[in-house]
Amino acid sequence: MFFFRPYIGNSYYQGIQGKKILVIGASFYCPKTECIYFDKCTNTSIKNSSPYDDICPEYKANGICLHDEPTNSIENGYSTYKTFAKGLFDIVGDNNYESIWSHLAFTNYVQFFLPSNGENFRTTRANDLSERDFDAFIDVVKDLSPDIVIVWGCVINTSVKEDNKFVIDKEMLKANEDYLCHMRIPGVNHDIAIVNPNHPSSSSWHSDKERFLYYLSRALNE
């Protein structure tokens, strides 16, 4: 079961061009090194922030829990989320950040907070991932039944594409430049397109954005 409760926009089920789109990022980070729970909450061996869900001092002071971070991130409008929304302006036909995200759902793949020193946010590493994260990903997909899953970046893509037992057309990945494949999940009554652009926080996002939009348009028109 997933720990982070996905953000679900008010118009998610209306979708974009009639297609429901779930966005999957990599990780959330905690920079509060002074917190008494920091070492255990962000421990990359334990990989479990859930014991601190409703007792984290930082979140409790703001009336939220750790599991609310997907919605918290969208509402705070961090630069990565703005960059991604801007990339969808032409497809959505709207240049308003809140409006674009209202048509999407979002969560991150890794199901615990990674540590940060407050100045540098390290990239997600392969050894940060676990089977629990994949199971949580599938549970989110079953719950939200998206038509398209947009997967940010190259850290989690092997788990979601190449190693994903539910992907039905792995042989087409090379022909699709590793941007597009499809999965079929028991309990979901339609095939789901996976579109895998570069991460919006990377410099490659800007140089490859048009290629991403090409494959997203293909998925929208299937």
Residue positions per predicted region:
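Active-site and ligand/interface coordination hotspots across diverse enzymes
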Residues: 1-76, 136-140, 179-186, 218-222
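Structural motif
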Residues: 23, 150, 194-196
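Short, solvent-exposed loop/turn segments at secondary-structure junctions
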Residues: 26-31, 110-114, 154-158, 199-203
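Surface-exposed cleft-lining segments at the edges of enzyme active sites
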Residues: 60-79, 110-129
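A short, Lys/Arg-enriched amphipathic alpha-helix followed by its capping loop at the start of a domain
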Residues: 87-99
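Short, contiguous, well-structured surface segments enriched in hydrophobic/aromatic residues
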Residues: 97-114
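C-terminal capping/extension of enzyme domains
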Residues: 122-138, 157-222
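Proline-aspartate-enriched helix->loop->beta-strand connector
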Residues: 137-154
